Each structure stands twice: as C-alpha cells, then as structure tokens.
Amino acid sequence: MLDDSLYKDTADEETKKYLRMNYQKKSRDNARTPMQWTAGHQAGFTSGNEPWMRVNDNYTAINAAAQTSKPDSVYHCWRQVLEKRKALKDIFVYGDYALVEDNEGTVNEKVYAYTRKAAGGETALIVCNFSIDKVAWKFDGKASEVLVSPGGKTVKDLSAGVINLGPCEAIAFLV
C-alpha cells in the first residue's frame, strides 16, 4: 500500500510518479468494483452519494437481486452445484479423482473431463467444455442421473454415449 506520508512529503514529481505507478501495479483496486446488490441507488452498495470506487454501469441489469429471481442464473447454478456436493459427499468430497480421456485415448484440448468415485462404487462424470466452440464428446458407460446441467440436458440427451456441449458448457451426471 502507498505510504501516505512518503507520498505527501515527496516534492520530486518523478518520485511521485514512480510511487503512484508502483502502487497501481500492486493494488487490486483496478480489478474490482463495489458489490452490485440491487438495481437501486449505487447498486445497493452504499447509501452515500458516491463510493470511493465507481459502481459498474451494468448494475441495473447485473446484480444479486436479479440473479436470485432468475431460475437459470449463475447464482442458481452454483446453488445447485453446492446442494449436490453436500448431498453426495461420498462422491464429491471423499471420492477418488481420475482424469478421463476421450475414446481415442487422448486428452481433448477443448474438454476437461474427470470422474469422482465413492468408496461404494457410485461414480460421477463431470465434463467441461472450456472452448468457444460446440463440442461432441464421446463417453463410455450409461448416464443414470443428470446432477447439474446449466444447458438443461437430460439422461435421454446422453443415451447415445455422446455429450453435445455448447461453448463454455459443463455437465455432471452419475454413471
């Protein structure tokens, strides 16, 4: 953090410029904004007229209140993920991790897939498309239950042993 006394007591403009530049490099202020709670005044972050950091312009559309009211929001997706993790601790907390290769025996550059297997044998397959392209990913086995699918996939969608994932889409299901 910038030492105020050092900065204020420095008469040399070049030193002030150097101190300011180093502060900006190390500060996290340029990477965050006030939490956007509501679409109201100052995004519900403060009742004051002006927070010390500017509220993002999109606060009327993107805020916590808007997320909690939309069933297909990021908020509800992560709520579902955490509920499943809590309900299936033997798999997701204590289960063994294994990286899954595609059917050609190679690791797909666009897809990150892995299993979590409980001591009792229950297994979840998690498939994440980290690309901006649609991906058809083949898997061995049969899906018995879709746990989390932001894209709305069902067991029927997985019945052919192929998962069609949209850009940046993921799915978790029991096999």
Describe each PLM feature range.
Residues N129-F130, V175:
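Residues immediately flanking
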Residues D157-V175:
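C-terminal beta-strand-rich structural cap/linker in extracellular carbohydrate-active enzymes
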Residues A118-A119, G151, V175:
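Short, flexible beta-strand-to-coil junctions
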